[in-house]
UniProtKB/Swiss-Prot annotation:
It is found in: Cell membrane. This is Sec-independent protein translocase protein TatB. One of its GO terms (biological process) is protein transport by the Tat complex. Keywords: Cell membrane, Membrane, Protein transport, Translocation, Transmembrane, Transmembrane helix, Transport. The chain crosses the membrane at residues 2-22. Residues 117-141 have a biased composition (Low complexity).
Length: 141
């Protein structure tokens, strides 16, 4: 409950309590708050142990689905889709459908042939210094 309250927030609460309650009533208020938190913690622990005692082995069966729900609560939509619908295969999201040795350099994969009009055999330094043109897709317009 107070797991994400830092020292800065605690200092602000103490200073606010000092201003609101005053120095003579602040220690009593801190003692009362600590006692109330301790009583609540003891009550919750007692209720949990009472449930565990009454339910017996069924209590663990009840906790198992709750722990699975807790795991799902922290999951992103992409991770949930990957885990439950795609059995952990996230290649549809990453675009790496075949992670064989063809992705490694020097695998003997032939270069992609150039399509479209152009010089059949370009030679000399002019072929290496021409800038790469952006591909044009007439269907995209």
């Amino acid at each position: 409950m107070f797991a994400n309250v830092g020292w800065g927030e605690m200092l602000v609460l103490v200073i606010a309590g000092l201003v609101i309650l005053g120095p003579e009533r602040l220690p009593g208020a801190i003692r009362w708050t600590a006692g109330a938190v301790r009583q609540a913690r003891d009550y919750i622990t007692g209720a949990t142990s009472q449930l565990r005692e009454d339910l017996g082995p069924e209590f663990d069966d009840l906790r198992e689905p709750l722990s699975e729900l807790q795991k799902l609560r922290g999951m992103t939509p992409r991770a949930a889709l990957t885990k439950h619908l795609l059995d952990g295969d996230d290649s549809i999201f990453t675009g790496r459908f075949d992670s064989t040795s063809s992705d490694q350099p020097g695998s003997g994969k032939p270069p992609k042939p150039q399509s479209g009009p152009g010089p059949a055999a370009a030679s000399g330094p002019a072929a290496t210094t021409t800038p790469a043109s952006t591909p044009f897709d007439p269907d995209a317009t």
